[in-house]
Amino acid sequence: MENYQSLSDHDLKILYEEAKETMDEYEQLQLVVKLNMNSLYGVSATIGYSLVDYDIAEDITGSARHYAVLVDIAINKFFTTWANDPENLEKVKKFVPNAIALANFKNYKRDSLDDLCIYGDTDSRYIDVYRIYTSLILVDDGNGNPVNMTFPPNTPEGNHEIAEFGVQLEKYFIAEIIANSIHNDIAKRGANDGYLKMALETISRKCVYQKKKKYIMSLIYKDGKVFDKPKLKLQGVEIKRGELSNKMKSIIQVLINKLILEDFTIDQIRGEIVKLFKYIKVKKDKSMIYRATSVSMKDIYKNDKGEWVSNKTHIQVKIAASWCNFIERNNLTDQYQRPFNGQKMNYYYDVTGNVIGVPDDVDMTTVPGLPEPDWNKMIKQTLVKPIMRYLFDENDFDDKDIDNFIMGIKKIEL
């Protein structure tokens, strides 16, 4: 490689193809190792496999959580005092040339809004780059006065700037914090060093975190590559799960794109929801507003009146019983069958408050005589409430909260 400058264009192309092939092979090998290790971890905690060993699974989970939390605390503590060391400013100037001062991260409180590590799992931590960018680095305003930096605009150039900032922040600060905190803890325990690794994987422009394993973010960087256009990463949210109709999930996807990728304001999203609310009520398409779940037939029986009933009160039993009674009352048993135990069923609430269930292999728009849905209730449940979870820090909203949001009435904090 030392003599590459003397190579001909032809030889350089050959060298490039060989290097590319080697990198592809290495990345595939990495993927195989990762999949194998994840599989071993998974089967160690699953009773159906011969390799099950709960002690091993607990050790792996506990160790990962321990070091993730350790790194979380170390990162926060570093930024609470980083302005006190002049060397840190010199490092920052390497990627923010007009920086003239640093500010310490004040009021750090673990697992609160005043925590730079805003989300995490057993093997990861998500750092608030926005806060570091806009409040912990001061630049020259042109007259020698220190001012906070303005976050780059939502443009390809702005996203590249954010991604580069995140990469440099990791290079000059975060990587060292992670390495030192892990090394010191391992040394303290007398364990073997060199087997734990943490690295920068993704950088996101905008994120919404709901709770454990439920989040959505706009990726602008992943595994060493900056994207020309942000890509959504979704984990555990409604549009990834089967509890809503495909039509409603598509509608929510459009609204999420506007919120996360196009920086729509809350009022703009509310305006879109109001228009959709009116449209769905006019269209009266049942296949848009149902929810879905698996049902149980084990505890359902016919009473003396010939009605399907159950001593259980959970929703899955009610859904199954409603369909059994509906097809018998309407003489439709020759066209439709009773659900089997564990079957997926779609359901909605009608105008009388009763739950109405239809097996997922039946098109509910073609079933004759189905009761009229409570359109207001179902649109709130399947459209408004899921979107509100992305807009606000809370996860639970009652009917009054939803009505106030639709009408644009802001909650007054007392």
For each of these PLM feature ranges, what is it?
Residues M1-D11, E17-L29, T61-R65, V69-G120, ...:
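DNA-dependent DNA polymerase catalytic subunits
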Residues E2-I14, L35-Y49:
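Active-site-adjacent bridging/hinge elements
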Residues V32:
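Ligand/cofactor-recognition surfaces for anionic moieties
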Residues G42-G48, I127-D128, L136-I137:
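Short acidic/His/Gly/Ser-rich catalytic and metal-binding motifs that mark active-site loops
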Residues I47-I60:
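Short, conserved non-catalytic motifs in the polymerase core
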